Structure formats: structure tokens, C-alpha cells
Amino acid sequence: WASQVSENRPVCKAIIQGKQFEGLVDTGADVSIIALNQWPKNWPKQKAVTGLVGIGTASEVYQSTEILHCLGPDNQESTVQPMITSIPLNLWGRDLLQQWGAEITMPAPLYSPTSQKIMTKMGYIPGKGLGKNEDGIKIPVEAKINQKREGIGYPF
């Protein structure tokens, strides 16, 4: 599962105890929270010992009495003991995201800012190909080391 930051919220599905839930990926949440209206009535819950901070005023906060089996969006095995309260959508917190191997990456640009300015002045449009009809290569050519130990490309 992957999601680019955009106007759309990063939402993914998880299966908890065989039941599918959809939730918002929330790296700012310490724990995962299931919306009270989505919590199955036959699943046990108890009043939470601690409150929730950062989601506004939650009057009733519960927690699952059991540690539950969970499958992440790409079938990652995990366990969770979620909090339960009246929120509009489920939140997948760091307790699950860490078990799923979630990462936040910000790729470095392929070219330096100086080379980008030079290319732009020469008429290059990002995302378009090189050449008169903008149909040429769109990604840089990678240098390959010559493993035969002869000719161009052989590291001395």
C-alpha cells in the first residue's frame, strides 16, 4: 500500500478479528482508535483508564478488553488493543503502523536546483520527454559498471 500526499486523506483497510475496517493513516496518533458506531456490539470493551488527547472532547472512551489479531493493508500480521470512542472515522495509529512497517519518505530531487534551472531555460517541461516533440526519455539514464574489467566503464 502506498499513498502520495494530496488533497485526499490517506485511508487504507485493515482486517481485525476477521472484520474489515477502513481507517485514516495517522502518524500523529500514538494508538489506533475505532469509531464507536463501527465497533461490533458482541466484542467486549471496557471504560478506558486514560483519556484521549488531540481529538477534541471525547465524552466516552473505551478500550478493547482483548488484544486483537489484525491484518494490515498488505496482509501484514499485527495485534492491536484499540481505543473506542465517538469519532467520524477510524484512525490507524503508530501502534499498528510500526507493526506494518510503515515509512514516510521524501525523495530527493533527481537533479540539483542549478541543473533544473538550466534545463527549464532550455525549454524543458518537468514530466515531459526531451526532444522537439517532448516524446523522448523522461527519466535519467543510469550509469552501469562494466563487470568484464575492460573498456569504458571499468573502475580502475
Curated annotation (Swiss-Prot):
Record carries keyword DNA-binding: no
PROSITE patterns (alphabetical): ASP_PROT_RETROV, ASP_PROTEASE, G_PATCH
Catalytic activity: Processing at the authentic HIV-1 PR recognition site and release of the mature p17 matrix and the p24 capsid protein, as a result of the cleavage of the -SQNY-|-PIVQ- cleavage site
Top-level taxon of the source organism: Eukaryota
EC class name: hydrolase
SUPFAM superfamilies linked: Acid proteases (SSF50630)
GO biological process, any: viral translational frameshifting
InterPro entries, alphabetized: Aspartic_peptidase_AS, G_patch_dom, HERV-K_Pro_peptidase_A2, Peptidase_A2_cat, Peptidase_aspartic_dom_sf, Retropepsin-like_cat_dom, Retropepsins
Boundaries of every G-patch domain copy: 111-156
Record PTM text: Autoproteolytically processed at the N-terminus. Expected C-terminal autoprocessing not detected. The sequence shown is that of the processed Pro protein.
EC id: 3.4.23.50
Entry keywords, A to Z: Aspartyl protease, Autocatalytic cleavage, ERV, Hydrolase, Protease, Transposable element
Catalytic residues identified in the record: D26
GO molecular function ontology, one term from the record: nucleic acid binding
Peptidase A2 domain ranges (all copies): 21-96
Additional detail: Insertional polymorphism. Provirus present in 29% of tested individuals.
Annotated function: Retroviral proteases have roles in the processing of the primary translation products and the maturation of the viral particle. Endogenous Pro proteins may have kept, lost or modified their original function during evolution.
UniProt record similarity statement: Belongs to the peptidase A2 family. HERV class-II K(HML-2) subfamily.
Name of the protein described by the UniProt record: Endogenous retrovirus group K member 113 Pro protein
Taxonomic placement: Eukaryota, Metazoa, Chordata, Craniata, Vertebrata
Gene that encodes it: HERVK_113
